[in-house]
């Protein structure tokens, strides 16, 4: 895949722009950070050249001047919401985030529980857990009339009921495990609390997507819409920016909805607002670091198709209706892409049709397509991995990396001693067996050395993956999708 984004240019421009905004605001600046800070996989997929740690690398230049505050929506704890890219709960991700921030030398000691209600026992238990771990927790309540009733919100009956976070540095980065966590409300509540204490403070937003200086229906912006389809977010032209400057800028519905509150609040607290539009609030320089628009457009279209398959599988797993996948189907239409644009889909389906059993296909980074079929010894995903490694290592397809004699004892262990009904080897078992063989086989060693070259490859399977295969592909950095059907009919599914 062609590089479409200049990482180094971005880091330089972005840190400079944040410092310029700090000088403009004066006093304390609350910087709302949208998206993921140090593992932004979505951005790295739709902007080839953007590395998952891009944003944290940029913030490292300001490390000694900032502290990090993590917000989490109490309702997400009650819903047991998870990060799909890492397959961990938001609850665990808060702890993971703080650990990583601290390891990198950032000050991170505050968590804000937003929209907490007294009957949310899951969130209350998490609050106690955080406090036992030595973290400082502030509680923010559900405010009636938010975000429309500005006068109530900017009062003791609004932000006044929230607990105030005692920050110690003049740049406060507010982040969260995912969207809808209440980052903006946290910033506004803090500004209100600062004003009550005579502290000058302001707000700015660093949201990677949608990219304000790309067209509304640019595939990169549409990919963000697909990624947030469960929130029913939509990209829109910023009407305030258009009115103020007669210039079109891309924003999204929640920013536009809350802007009147932010503007009114800043006027009530400071006498005036520095911003005429939601776009003015932002400090995002991502669009200015795109160096190959065509490469980014193609990467974004592929991401939209992946999101569509993911929605179909999630709906099948959770036995939900097709609301989310239907929204993404509309986005696909706007972006001008279909499932046929994902080359591995047709190849995997061809394998299934010709064998009558589940099939799998991978597109290597140079465009070669490799398939895997289900056999008595191997599942199709495991077979595909072995075939892909042989292709990368230049090993003839007729060569067995693992002999039937080496596989059969593993099958016996699974079925006779470990209680498995499926004798076929999964991807993890195949890779362990290959690692053992590599000690005595130069061919196996060559194949194993190619594992790193699977990262970033696209894979499609004709049935929903089990948790083991799914986890292995995630760890390998493979971009996998599946048809929304199970290999066998059953009511109970082990996750």
From Swiss-Prot:
<dbReference type="InterPro" id="IPR048496">
    <property type="entry name" value="DUF1846_N"/>
</dbReference>
<dbReference type="InterPro" id="IPR048441">
    <property type="entry name" value="DUF1846_C"/>
</dbReference>
<protein>
    <recommendedName>
        <fullName>UPF0371 protein Cgl2998/cg3325</fullName>
    </recommendedName>
</protein>
<dbReference type="InterPro" id="IPR014999">
    <property type="entry name" value="DUF1846"/>
</dbReference>
<dbReference type="Pfam" id="PF08903">
    <property type="entry name" value="DUF1846"/>
</dbReference>
<dbReference type="Pfam" id="PF20921">
    <property type="entry name" value="DUF1846_C"/>
</dbReference>
<comment type="similarity">
    <text>Belongs to the UPF0371 family.</text>
</comment>
